[in-house]
UniProtKB/Swiss-Prot annotation:
This is Acetyl-coenzyme A carboxylase carboxyl transferase subunit alpha. One of its GO terms (cellular component) is acetyl-CoA carboxylase complex. InterPro entries: Acetyl_CoA_COase_a_su (IPR001095), ClpP/crotonase-like_dom_sf (IPR029045), COA_CT_C (IPR011763). Its EC number is 2.1.3.15. Gene3D superfamilies: 2-enoyl-CoA Hydratase, Chain A, domain 1. Its main location: cytoplasm. GO terms for biological process: fatty acid biosynthetic process; malonyl-CoA biosynthetic process. It comes from the Bacteria. It is an enzyme of class 2 (transferase). Component of the acetyl coenzyme A carboxylase (ACC) complex. First, biotin carboxylase catalyzes the carboxylation of biotin on its carrier protein (BCCP) and then the CO(2) group is transferred by the carboxyltransferase to acetyl-CoA to form malonyl-CoA. Residues 35-296 form the CoA carboxyltransferase C-terminal domain.
Amino acid sequence: MSLNFLEFEKPIAELEAKIEALRDVSRHGGDSAVDLDKEIEQLEKKSLELKKKTFSNLGAWETAQLARHPLRPYTLDYIKHAFDEFDELAGDRAFADDKAIVGGIARLEGRPVMIIGHQKGRETKEKVKRNFGMPKPEGYRKALRLMEMAERFNMPIITFIDTAGAYPGVGAEERGQSEAIATNLKVMSGLKVPVICNVVGEGGSGGALAIGVGDYVNMLQYSTYSVISPEGCASILWRDSDKAPQAADAMGLTAPRLKELELIDEIIEEPLGGAHRDHAQMAANMKANLLRQLEDLEQLDHETLLERRYQRLMNYGYC
């Protein structure tokens, strides 16, 4: 699988290319294979050290690029690796089925849970089908329907957030985009079941927040969460989208900064180089975190759960 190296990963990409070339020669190299094996081993050590150095010192803009990586695991990838018996549920029962939101019932180590998440798509046709992960009102109303179903059947809700934002098209606005988002915020704040939200890529504005109100809000190590994209911010402040790196630094959109501000609860570690390098390992890290948090929340009665969530919301922005 091609890893689609980003601009700041060029030195790593060059080393990986050398290693792959030597491996190819080694496979057909006869007597020189032993010497090549030693050289490959040295280059692999050098590559590992370079990765550790690079990813231990990422800026906000580099993190934003990783959050958008085209091979990053999406909701359906987490479902595949971390859950069992997934049964997808479709439609908002009012207008249409928005493929930018996927959801349904699954089992997490035997527990029935409701899963809801954004889905961007990988190939061109799927990206168009999923509207590039930007939901319309019917997507958020589908999510609302599933959340209310989960409450009726006393199932915990797990959400996966990865969107540039809610779709801003004319049709979406005509069908009540802002109302759909606002209704979700209201309903999620009062659900009588545990809700765990996970930002796994881009957390873009109200489009992310519409499935992001919960008892725990987690972010992956290289995900982002912000009111606007760095490019959008730069276009407004400086009339120049090329200043997106400066905007990213100023916005405080990274997981460590948001945890420092107490806007999120936990940061989930990614494999070295980012979640796209090992979907199975990333899903395992996610699963372990979900199980621990669910065990904590399942000890609480409804009143305590709601009071704790209310206090969490009221503390946002409090200094």
